């Protein structure tokens, strides 16, 4: 634990604001967007040739051009720029991008314009002395790029290619935002993130073709070693995501336990996996994927064994259906509080959706060897590509249909304390104290009553209150005046497409806090609550502010402290109105 805190604090180094020349190596496949190309990189030297600590990872953002689009994993670059510490925009309920980069060990970011960088050489062009971990990671990602090229050569394209790459290799950069929202809305985002479920399909294949034929002791040892190598090779190929590393560690411990006649699939092996992972990379402690993976596995290990002796488990088909539902329910039960707290949404249909698409996901993963063999040999490429595309279409169509069901997406506003309370109740419920049926029922009824009371208190504390929100949006300056969840006003300088530009705030803040969309005001406006004239806004509860967008207020000296509480200087303003507000500087707050 203390190593995690130390590693987190170690990322808070201060970068110099001066422009310098740096050498860096790209650590992942560059992500191409409409205007920029982004990539994770590791610094290897400064402008004076001095060595830079190898944990000095950066996020590089290139201005998009034909040269930037050719960048690959392992390329070594020299660039000039100002490295700054990642910061969020400060908008309410926004995605914590700074924390996301910090969890990946990235302590700085830099924008690199055209002709401000030069590629020295690629990964294969020169022998370099990198650490073993970095070298293996780059090689694994290069192999993954080659496999993706094989996928493309078979004729896979579009949404089918993006889904197949995500399910088999963990490459999610090609997935559209619409498809990601569908998987997240139905509660099956774990299907797109490589985890124990995907590795479980691979393990089932290994058991069928390798371990079932290893009867003698030395053959079992050889088979276990071969299976472990294949599992870890696949994990490295996928980029070592925390959820997949956890599954690979537990499977390795399970194989080791089977050789000595002991079960390696237990809470003890789960705890050992967590300790080993945090020793390797303490920053995984803050990764939400790491947290959800271990919570889901803890729920499966503690809840599922209690239902193995039920009478209905005697029939094979019923047992398969019941066990699949039980595993999904146990995993969802222990992850819902954290998902609701971190993401503000959860789905009632997550367990059912997982049960429906699991067979399709299994067929897609089992199709990976076939599509590779077809792409390499050139035999049956059309048939394989058509079959993979058809399976992917069926899976996506099933989830799109579920997305239309009532209460498919439930928006929540859980506080940290309510989330902790939910986990306290769950942990006590699975303790030996509640093993007997009577105690479990008694504690269950009591915990339901107390949880409902805690939920009511949570809603009271999280209820929206009158406030003014100044959104940090460079292309759409906006001020949100909120009176209640039913009544609010959005003042903006943009005449067109205000809702489209504010869509990410709408999804994260408005749908979570407001029961009705705000009234968009782009000009003069007046009603019983608020009025606006040339950017000067005044309303009930003493609300008053001025949005400076042009020079219409220049030369006016009547801006006394009693008239305006906030002065919002919008981007592009070049007037002289600020010269006449010095007498109100004690009470007026300036926002730019």
Where on the chain are the PLM-derived regions?
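Hydrophobic alpha-helical transmembrane segments in integral membrane proteins
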Residues: 2-19, 438-444, 451-477
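Membrane-interface helix/helix-cap signal primarily in integral membrane proteins
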Residues: 2-190, 522-526, 557
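Divalent metal-coordination and catalytic microenvironments
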Residues: 81, 167, 195, 239, ...
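Core dinuclear metal-dependent hydrolase active-site scaffold
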Residues: 283-286, 403-417, 421-423, 432, ...
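Conserved small/polar residues in nucleotide/adenosyl-binding loops
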Residues: 580-587
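Membrane-interface amphipathic/re-entrant loop segments adjacent to transmembrane helices
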Residues: 119-138, 185, 340-356, 366-423
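Hydrophobic alpha-helical transmembrane segments in multi-pass membrane proteins
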Residues: 110, 171, 175-351, 412-463
């Amino acid at each position: 634990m203390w190593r995690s805190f130390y590693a987190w604090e170690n990322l808070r180094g201060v970068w110099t604001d001066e422009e310098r020349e740096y050498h860096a190596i790209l650590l992942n496949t560059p992500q191409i967007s409409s205007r920029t190309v982004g990539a994770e990189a590791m610094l290897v030297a400064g402008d004076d040739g001095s060595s830079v600590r190898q944990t000095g990872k950066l996020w590089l953002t290139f201005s998009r051009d034909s040269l930037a689009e050719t960048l690959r994993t392992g390329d070594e670059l020299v660039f000039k720029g100002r490295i700054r510490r990642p910061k969020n925009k400060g908008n309410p309920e926004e995605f914590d991008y700074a924390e996301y980069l910090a969890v990946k060990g990235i302590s700085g970011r830099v924008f690199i314009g055209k002709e401000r960088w030069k590629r020295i050489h690629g990964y294969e062009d020169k022998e370099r002395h990198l650490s073993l971990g970095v070298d293996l990671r780059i090689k694994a990602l290069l192999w993954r790029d080659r496999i993706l090229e094989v996928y493309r050569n078979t004729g896979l394209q579009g949404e089918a290619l993006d889904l197949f790459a995500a399910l088999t290799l963990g490459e999610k950069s090609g997935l559209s935002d619409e498809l990601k929202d569908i998987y997240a809305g139905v509660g099956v985002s774990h299907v797109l993130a490589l985890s124990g479920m995907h590795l479980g399909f691979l393990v089932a294949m290994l058991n069928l073709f390798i371990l079932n034929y290893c009867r003698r002791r030395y053959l079992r040892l050889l088979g276990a070693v071969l299976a472990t190598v294949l599992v870890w090779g696949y994990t490295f190929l996928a980029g070592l995501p925390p959820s997949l590393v956890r599954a690979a560690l537990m499977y390795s411990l399970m194989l080791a336990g089977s050789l000595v006649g002991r079960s390696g699939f237990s809470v003890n092996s789960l705890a050992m996996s967590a300790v080993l992972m945090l020793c390797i990379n303490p920053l995984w402690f803050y990764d939400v994927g790491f947290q959800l993976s271990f919570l889901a596995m803890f729920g499966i290990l503690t809840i599922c064994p209690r239902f193995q002796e039920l009478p209905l488990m005697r029939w094979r088909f019923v047992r398969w259906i019941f066990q699949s539902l039980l595993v999904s329910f146990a995993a969802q039960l222990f992850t819902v509080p954290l998902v609701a707290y971190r993401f503000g949404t959860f789905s009632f249909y997550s367990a059912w959706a997982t049960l429906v698409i699991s067979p399709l996901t299994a067929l897609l993963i089992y199709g990976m060897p076939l599509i590779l063999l077809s792409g390499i040999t050139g035999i049956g490429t059309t048939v394989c590509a058509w079959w993979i595309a058809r399976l992917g279409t069926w899976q996506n169509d099933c989830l799109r249909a579920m997305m239309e069901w009532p209460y498919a997406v439930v928006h929540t506003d859980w506080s940290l304390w309510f989330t902790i309370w939910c986990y306290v109740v769950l942990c006590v419920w699975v303790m030996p104290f509640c093993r007997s049926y009577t105690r479990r029922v008694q504690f269950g009824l009591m915990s339901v009553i107390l949880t409902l009371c805690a939920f009511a208190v949570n809603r009271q504390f999280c209820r929206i209150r009158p406030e003014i929100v100044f959104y940090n949006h460079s292309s759409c300056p906006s001020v949100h005046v909120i009176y209640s969840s039913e009544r609010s006003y959005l003042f903006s300088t943009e005449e067109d497409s205000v809702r489209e530009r504010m869509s990410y705030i709408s999804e994260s803040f408005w749908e979570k806090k407001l029961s009705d969309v705000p009234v968009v005001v782009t000009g003069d406006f007046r009603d019983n609550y608020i009025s606006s004239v040339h950017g000067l806004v005044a309303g009930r509860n003493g609300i008053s502010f001025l949005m400076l967008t042009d020079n219409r207020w220049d030369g006016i000296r009547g801006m006394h402290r009693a008239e305006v509480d906030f002065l919002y200087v919008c981007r592009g303003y070049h007037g002289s109105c600020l010269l006449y507000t010095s007498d109100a500087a004690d009470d007026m707050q300036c926002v730019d």
